[in-house]
């Protein structure tokens, strides 16, 4: 039967999309179109009578607890694999938490420590699974490190520790042609002044890291040279140990010990083993490309030319070590070079050596301390510093105001700073002028009056008339705009006026009463107190004629315009007085 079914042909039903045998296809097609329908969502064939149930059970929209909407048939798979609020178990404490909070909880829970029963160390909880693999190995490594002496291996070189020293050494070596430093024999080690150091001195912190770095750099260079020349390995190893001992002994020593001829006290090695020390031997080496320096025109090897030109440049910062001469420089002893370098390094001249100083130091400059703050400055800068010094006392700023007298008429609320800033113009009277001339007003002023002097400055007279009033010794107030004459002048004028009333006066001796404006010169400054404004009737005129007496009670008042009127000729004034 199976073979028969396999051999027979089949056709695809258009309704249910299934393969139907050919001999049953007609019956199936009629039955399928009548009773079976296809779901429009999932495209699966279902009986038409069960289509509504299928749509309600499988394809209705539901909401998950994570507020996501999806079909009901997909809810189960979403809740098991995709929902962020599904429960999960912590791998450290077996506590069920939502997936959203699980990561934060595991980080916190895994940071706890538990005591290992095997090695006795506190181990993190998150490392408990991998700890048995390394348990006990840390203690073995520590024991191994303690068993190995420090001299058995070289300390790894730190770039940030020796960078400064290496750069300085390169610049110093570039000053002169490269040469090998003379070795120091081991028998000189016992004669070294630093050999008698105690254990406490060896444990002190290094006060001169620059010297130590220099020794270590030199030690590394000697090690490299020893690799290039195996025949001198014994000498180089001895020199290496000796330089290491020097670097250890130099720690914690005072600066004075370095300056007391440390480099001269050590005996030099055999000159025969020191290698070439002359400039001609080094430059005459075979198979070397020599190029001239663009500054000093000397020949140097190709690999050292850049370093030499950097140090030979006149604008380079190494002015203290480089003489700047364009001539051929002599070969200097390396011990002298290192000694000068150490002395400059210990005297706080690192900025000059490294090229960090902004400008060269001022030579032959006098350093004087500030008298207020004590800061030591150069002579050229000290004057400007003391003028603006913060420590300067307050009394030093009021020297210019000591000679100014106090002002009586100044209001109380006027600040001293405001009065100090007021500018005094030429010709103005000072505010304390009246206080200075009070004693003179008591004695009585004496003036040399010239009767023939005419008024030629009305403005000066008006300024004198409008001066402010001041205190007076007597109770009587003076007339406005009239200056008080002394006793002798007033008696002469009164006598002449009385003589004119009694009889005729000769034309040659006519009394003249001059206007008050022309009694004094235009630049005359009075030195007596002024009275308050009042009324004075010296120029009063009545209908019957001019009165011959001066009466303060019955006197009239002339306006300012009448006072400013130009004076008459002297002859006309005399004739008018004779008519009266």
UniProtKB/Swiss-Prot annotation:
This is TRAF-type zinc finger domain-containing protein 1. Expressed in skeletal muscle, brain, liver, kidney, spleen and bone marrow. Expression depends on STAT1. PANTHER family: TRAF-TYPE ZINC FINGER DOMAIN-CONTAINING PROTEIN 1, TRAF-TYPE ZINC FINGER PROTEIN-RELATED. GO terms for biological process: negative regulation of innate immune response. InterPro entries: Innate_Immune_Apopt_Reg (IPR051986), TRAFD1-XIAF1_Znf (IPR049439), Znf_RING/FYVE/PHD (IPR013083), Znf_TRAF (IPR001293). Induction: By lipopolysaccharide (LPS), IFNB1 and IFNG, IFNB1 being most rapid and potent inducer (at protein level). Not induced by anti-inflammatory cytokines, such as IL4 and IL10, which also inhibit LPS induction of TRAFD1. The modification Phosphoserine is found at residues 278, 320, 326-327, 409, 415, 430, 450, 469, 532. Disruption phenotype: Mice show no gross developmental abnormalities, but exhibit an increased susceptibility to LPS-induced septic shock and are more sensitive to poly(I:C) shock, suffering more severe hepatic damage than wild-type animals. In response to LPS-stimulation, bone marrow-derived dendritic cells display an increased production of pro-inflammatory cytokines, such as IL6, TNF and IL12, as well as elevated IKK and JNK activation, compared to wild-type mice. Mutant embryonic fibroblasts are more resistant to vesicular stomatitis virus (VSV)-induced cytopathic effect. GO terms for molecular function: zinc ion binding. The keyword Phosphoprotein applies. The modification N-acetylalanine is found at residue 2. The keyword Acyltransferase does not apply. Residues 395-453, 468-509, 524-580 are annotated as: Disordered.
